[in-house]
Amino acid sequence: MGKYGDKKVVDLSEWGRPLARVITRFLKDKPVSVIQVTNFHLLLSLYSAWLIYEGNTVLACFLLIVKGVIDAVDGELARTRERPSHVGRYWDTVVDTISLIAVMCAFGSLYDWGIAFTFGMIFAILFQYSLFNHYSILMRALGSGDATSRIDERVRPVAHPWEKQRNVNILHFIYLCFFNWQDRIISALSGKGSKSLVFELTVSSTLGFGMQSLLIFGLALTQSLEYLPHLVLGVNMFLMVSVLLRSRL
């Protein structure tokens, strides 16, 4: 069964999922944990940020595409081994945010954005990711019944038998402190959505890292990365507003 069960939806951020599944099949019986995979794409992101800081943007942006594929492997590996993990999904959120901050700060340094503008870019992207995540969670619940991720994370989850409750509690607390506000704002802005959620998921999926990494790589190849703010604050914000408006019609 796919990520969204039997629902026929177009998730543009999932273009790398077939490759992620190939890697997952290779790792399934190897002594590699899901957390180790997550930590690897964190290191890859930090290395990409350093390359951007050094001005090697094409290689850096290509590695961000690779990072996006590896980012899909940890979830696929957990599903293949039938070991969903609260620790894993919370840690994945923390890692993605650290990666985003590092990469955007590197771009900010390279293009002299200034501190305020750089953090404005970071917050804009966080909200765009949160919108996509919001509809991805709803569609997974609607299509496959997957309830591992939740729209409202305020209730502390009970650890699975293969993970420690103490670790779940710590990462759940971190999530509530640093990330829950994004979910609550997006939930407040979003309406009930269309019956099938196809429009909302498809359009918001362009805001996911998988699709955004391709667009950013395209900007790097054409030496047009100075237009990155136009993508994030212009095109992406227009798509975000379109989804929010559609969800209320």
What are these regions (language model features)?
Residues 52-59, 109-116, 221-229:
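Transmembrane helix interruption/hinge and helix-loop junction motifs
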Residues 45-53, 103-107, 133, 220, ...:
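Structural signal for membrane-spanning alpha-helices in multi-pass inner-membrane proteins
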Residues 22, 26, 72, 76, ...:
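Membrane-spanning helices that line or support transport/gating and their immediate boundary helices
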Residues 60-67, 116-125, 229-239:
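Hydrophobic core segments of alpha-helical transmembrane domains in multi-pass membrane proteins
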Residues 34-39, 91-96, 201-210:
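Select subsegments of transmembrane alpha-helices in polytopic membrane proteins
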Residues 108-138:
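Alpha-helical transmembrane segments
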Residues 34-87, 103-104, 120-123:
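Membrane-embedded alpha-helical segments that form the functional core of polytopic membrane enzymes
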Residues 1-18, 138-249:
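C-terminal membrane-associated helical module and adjoining short loops/tails
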